[in-house]
Amino acid sequence: MSRKCAVTGKGVQTGNNVSHANNKSRRRWLPNLQETSLLSDTLGRMVRLRLSTNGIRTIEHKGGLDAALLDIPDARLNQDARRVKKQIQKAIEAKKATA
């Protein structure tokens, strides 16, 4: 599993630690990723995604998992999030067809 947020795409960054004497040593900055379970109202079940804390805030700001995934373009989502988005879209279409 990659160290990338499923929603925001935030990942590992690299650079240098620079000392007072200007000595440089390579280092990595890891994103604050959390394995979260979020409720999908449309699917009626919990969905597990690996999200950054910023990604969790984005989902809450947009009004929940379903609204956020439908609003975010596919290019920004990882494979797991795209799969959930497609399931949500199919469930919405099925509800419209039966109604």
UniProtKB/Swiss-Prot annotation:
The gene is rpmB. Gene3D superfamilies: Ribosomal protein L28/L24 (2.30.170.40). One of its GO terms (cellular component) is ribonucleoprotein complex. Residues 1-25 are annotated as: Disordered. This is Large ribosomal subunit protein bL28. One of its GO terms (molecular function) is structural constituent of ribosome. The keyword Lipid biosynthesis does not apply. Residues 11-22 have a biased composition (Polar residues). Pfam families: Ribosomal_L28.
